[in-house]
Amino acid sequence: MDTDYTDWISSFNEVDTTSLKICLKRKLADEIDYLQTVAGPDLQKFIQMVRHKYMIDNVINIIEGCKNKTAKEIIEARSEPLGYLPEISGLINLDVRKIDELYEDVLIDTEVGFYFSAFLEDVIANSEIKQISTINNYLQELKPEKIKNHLKKIWLEHFYQFSQTMNGTTREFMEDLLKFEADCQAIQIIYNSLAYDYNQFQEEERKKLIPYFGRLFK
């Protein structure tokens, strides 16, 4: 085998689909690392905001893994290389019995802390939850997938706001890409909700998770 991935793949005694997937993701992350180092300021910012999506995935993976007492090695193996965070090891070792403290004391200090901070503000603003103990109980019961969808909505809207600061063709391309991503999220949320009995409450809950832009947005 003579490709750009040869050195990576040769490190495995046997190449199965899982190992190959891990290898290719790491190689892709390395290539994007290089691209980011030689890019201009706007492209660097764009790439970094793309990576925020995978950082959010990694943090949610850690929260879910810790709550389920998943082995540290398995949690690390599931991490997306494109979403690498220096704080990952520290997060994995945290006691998540008080999950609100994890959000407030640790995640807000990470690069994607802005999204988690905005998420917590939304939780408090859109509910009767005011006491820290009540927030902790609420977050413990909330499914990680719903937290992730909420965070992705905040990320997409923040990314879209950034695209509006660009000019000309750059702005047009970024808008098209982000609208496509927003539509994909909207479709996924609606599809996942079809398993439940449809009612007015559920419709309102879905709207909270769908970005305010995109070709499907009304």
Outline where the language-model segments fall.
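N-terminal domain-start signal
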Residues: 1-218
